[in-house]
A protein has these predicted regions:
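Bacterial signal peptide processing site
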Residues: 21-23
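Hydrophobic helical h-region of N-terminal Sec-dependent signal peptides
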Residues: 8-13
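Alpha-helical segments in soluble extracytoplasmic regions
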Residues: 29-117, 123-144
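Bacterial N-terminal signal peptides that target proteins for export
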Residues: 1-7
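C-terminal motif of bacterial Sec signal peptides marking the signal peptidase cleavage site
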Residues: 16-19
Length: 144
């Protein structure tokens, strides 16, 4: 169970999402991927630090500690990644693909916030679809 829980944390931390973007000029796909990966890498590093603190005593966290970790650290971090990536303007030709990615990621966040106990207890990762979409788009730092 610990392995699956930390696997979900890693997947969530690396979640790659992108959004509709602001009113800025559209980026090229290469620019979008570069900036998106930088956003995810920063978020991942922050979560790695938090996870190291969680397991610093060498003892596996109990269920309540895991739930608190997800609620207090993982989900806000990933939501921040989603929000930051949504500020990027993807290439016009990729808008639909990017919209699907962000919708999938937000759905996973909402599901997780709605029943964190079930997410922690499950071997399934609610972010699998978003991770797959991120990886397919080239956001390697965002799809773990």
């Amino acid at each position: 169970m610990m392995r699956s829980t930390f696997a979900i944390a890693a997947a969530v931390a690396g979640l790659g999402v992108a959004g509709c973007g602001g009113d800025d000029k559209a980026l090229t796909k290469a620019e979008f991927v570069k900036q998106g990966n930088a956003i995810c890498a920063k978020g991942n590093a922050e979560l790695e630090t938090e996870e190291e603190e969680l397991i610093a005593d060498g003892k596996a966290p109990d269920r309540e500690e895991l739930i608190a970790f997800f609620e207090d650290e993982v989900l806000p971090n990933v939501q921040g990644q989603i929000d930051d990536l949504a500020e990027l303007t993807p290439p016009e030709a990729d808008q639909g693909e990017v919209d699907e990615l962000i919708a999938s990621a937000q759905e996973a966040i909402d599901k997780s916030e709605g029943d964190m106990e079930a997410v922690v207890a499950s071997d399934e990762n609610p972010f699998d679809d978003a991770d797959e979409k991120a990886g397919a788009y080239g956001l390697a730092e965002c799809a773990i």
